[in-house]
């Protein structure tokens, strides 16, 4: 039994990190402290001053442990790492690590390419961004392709390299074919410079050049050509619209503010890159486990920048705790000075007010949608309960499906709807192991047996404390099982559950002549439901989702089997090396033609691997 009184007495008066655990041994909260003794003792004293969430957390604490560090900065870094590792329930948790996309221009190549990447490497290439809106990045690339002819292939093209036959893009004027030697490195480089200038807001030269060409084509009665230049001008205008300048200092800055109502809070962040608002992001949080606004923003900064690939030069906030400590931590992560500022007036204060206004609007919309969705899903599930005469509302529904093509690569899928909404984290996939050929009944029997056997085993392990609840994949059972098939599949499910001594209601779908669901079968009774009924719409949604999930998995298995690369047969060439070779040379044929020195020029290829490649292709001749 954990002795709280004794443990609180012996905590050292040093900086460090503390971990709160529940009765299952799960880490439910991670915190840092300048003085561990003072901070940890606060949780178990003056509970009236705590928020409701803190009181709930303290009730769940069965034990705690701590790690002493040499400094508060060390404690902050360790706290961030442990929060990432354990994802504790009572910490502010944003989405998974945010790796926003960059536009990468491979200026380290003779003939650069432009594409989207989420990894910023020190490889000599030019990176623009990051951009918070992924769709906007891809749209920007498409617009650039309309304006400038660029190569999109992965060939390793050198200025005086051996020419190859140009691809279709050259013939439809989307590429200038540097692979065939049709353009010099210098001329191609001028195009790249124009692209970089355009993306940096220096678009006057590009616009003037296009206008001159359009007017010239028009005066020569080349109307199609003139229309092409007009379309390019419109594309430039679209790129320009995405880059509204709101600051004259052309620096990278983030603006963070929030708005809260009772326990609900929306934190909003505006991203300013080179003086232009490039996007925004919001996070809906529960503020009740933290203190004042300054404490919340401090935790938000640690959470957000602990998981993002880019940190701006300046971050503006309305208030914050531990400002000097956070600045030092961010500066060490970035490798250069980062400032956190609290503007009281002027342009920066106006932007912060704008961020708060957006946060308020976002929170109001979120709460309204939540209310509408909750009522809709709750009413639908209650109606489903009444139609099937279930004892409980089916808050958790599991649906199953089998997918195969002519008996090959049979797979089973399980999806979960929790309180009317898909719960993707609980989706599971099963590769059929014991059934040969296309036998949906036996395949369904196999996956249901595996699913519920695993569940029973996990429950035993959790009870023995050999397994944490968070580490279990099958221990939560559904309130209702929904089978895509009719009576046959329902009977298979009931047979499996009976053998395992599990009591869960099972219903199936009744199809019409066109294979469309027209109702449900439950307890050997068919229940017809009108197509415009909310229940039928919900069932159709579940059915579509389980089909989508099953087919996606089946397709991935099939592709993995069909797309077997010859590189997989070469000794000393693993997945990482295969990937890098294909990125560098573009195709197996080009790898086959590569010289020993060219192979060695690939990052992960050493002398032994290069020799294996040469020997393999020589022996294959």
Swiss-Prot record:
UVR domain boundaries: 204-239
Subcellular location: Cytoplasm
Molecular function terms, GO-annotated: DNA binding; excinuclease ABC activity
Keywords assigned: Cytoplasm, DNA damage, DNA excision, DNA repair, Excision nuclease, SOS response
One GO process term, biological-process aspect: nucleotide-excision repair
PROSITE patterns reported in the protein's UniProt record: GIY_YIG, UVR, UVRC
Protein's UniProt keywords contain Membrane: no
Superkingdom of this protein's organism: Bacteria
CDD domains: GIY-YIG_UvrC_Cho
Keyword Coiled coil: no
Domain GIY-YIG: 13-92
Recorded GO CC terms: cytoplasm; excinuclease repair complex
Family annotation (PANTHER family): UVRABC SYSTEM PROTEIN C, UVRC/OXIDOREDUCTASE
Role: The UvrABC repair system catalyzes the recognition and processing of DNA lesions. UvrC both incises the 5' and 3' sides of the lesion. The N-terminal half is responsible for the 3' incision and the C-terminal half is responsible for the 5' incision.
Family according to the record: Belongs to the UvrC family.
Subunit structure: Interacts with UvrB in an incision complex.
NCBIfam families: PRK00558.1-5, uvrC
Full protein name: UvrABC system protein C
Lineage, highest ranks first: Bacteria, Bacillati, Bacillota, Clostridia, Eubacteriales
């Amino acid at each position: 039994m954990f002795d709280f009184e004794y443990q609180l007495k012996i905590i050292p008066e040093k900086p460090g990190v503390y971990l709160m655990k529940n009765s299952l041994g799960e880490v439910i909260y991670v915190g840092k402290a300048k003085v561990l003794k003072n901070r940890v003792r606060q949780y178990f004293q003056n509970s009236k001053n705590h928020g409701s969430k803190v009181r709930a957390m303290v009730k769940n604490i069965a034990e705690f442990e701590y790690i002493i560090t040499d400094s508060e900065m060390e404690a902050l870094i360790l706290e961030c790492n442990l929060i990432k590792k354990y994802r504790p329930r009572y910490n502010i948790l944003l989405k998974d690590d945010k790796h926003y996309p960059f536009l990468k221009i491979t200026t380290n190549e003779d003939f650069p390419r432009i594409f989207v990447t989420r990894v910023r490497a020190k490889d000599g290439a030019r990176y623009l961004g990051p951009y918070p809106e992924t769709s906007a990045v891809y749209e920007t690339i498409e617009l650039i392709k309309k304006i400038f002819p660029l190569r999109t292939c992965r060939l390793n093209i050198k200025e005086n390299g051996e020419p190859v036959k140009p691809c279709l893009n050259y013939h439809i004027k989307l590429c200038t074919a540097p692979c065939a030697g049709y353009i010099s490195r210098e001329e191609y480089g001028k195009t790249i410079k124009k692209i970089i200038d355009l993306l940096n807001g220096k678009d006057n030269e590009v616009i003037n050049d296009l206008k001159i060409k359009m007017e010239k084509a028009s005066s020569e009665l080349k109307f199609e050509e003139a229309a092409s230049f007009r379309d390019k001008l419109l594309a430039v205008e679209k790129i320009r619209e995405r880059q509204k300048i709101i600051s004259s200092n052309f620096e990278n800055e983030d603006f963070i503010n929030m708005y809260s109502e009772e326990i609900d809070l929306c934190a909003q962040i505006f991203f300013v890159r080179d003086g232009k608002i490039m996007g925004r992001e919001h996070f809906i949080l529960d503020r009740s486990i933290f203190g004042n606004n300054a404490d919340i923003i401090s935790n938000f900064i640690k959470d957000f920048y602990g998981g993002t690939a880019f940190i701006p030069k300046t971050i503006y906030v309305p208030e914050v705790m531990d400002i000097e400590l956070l600045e030092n931590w961010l500066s060490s992560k970035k490798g250069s000075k980062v400032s956190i500022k609290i503007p009281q007036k002027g342009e920066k204060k106006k932007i912060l007010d704008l961020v708060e206004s957006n946060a308020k609007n976002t929170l109001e919309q979120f709460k309204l949608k939540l209310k509408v969705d909750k009522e809709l899903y709750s009413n639908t599930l209650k109606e489903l309960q009444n139609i099937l005469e279930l004892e409980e509302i089916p808050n958790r529904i599991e649906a199953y499906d089998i997918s195969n093509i002519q008996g090959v690569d049979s797979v089973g899928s399980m999806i979960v709807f929790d309180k009317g909404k898909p719960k993707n984290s609980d989706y599971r996939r099963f590769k059929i192991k014991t059934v040969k050929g296309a036998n949906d009944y036996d395949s369904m029997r196999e996956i249901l047996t595996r699913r519920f056997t695993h569940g029973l085993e996990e429950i035993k392990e959790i009870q023995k404390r050999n397994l944490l609840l968070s580490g279990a994949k099958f221990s939560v059972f559904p309130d209702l099982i929904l089978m895509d098939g009719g009576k046959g599949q329902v009977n298979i499910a009931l047979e499996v559950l009976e053998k395992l001594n599990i009591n869960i209601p099972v219903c199936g779908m009744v199809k019409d002549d066109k294979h469309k669901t027209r109702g449900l079968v439950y307890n050997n009774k068919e229940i017809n439901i009108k197509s415009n009924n909310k229940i039928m719409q919900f069932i159709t949604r579940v059915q579509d989702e389980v089909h989508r999930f099953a087919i996606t998995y089946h397709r991935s298995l099939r592709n993995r089997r069909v797309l077997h690369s010859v590189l997989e047969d070469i000794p000393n060439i693993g997945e990482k090396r295969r990937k890098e070779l294909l990125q560098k040379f573009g195709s197996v044929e080009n790898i086959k033609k590569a010289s020993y020195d060219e192979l060695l020029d690939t990052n992960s290829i050493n002398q032994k691997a290069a020799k294996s490649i040469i020997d393999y292709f020589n022996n294959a001749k």
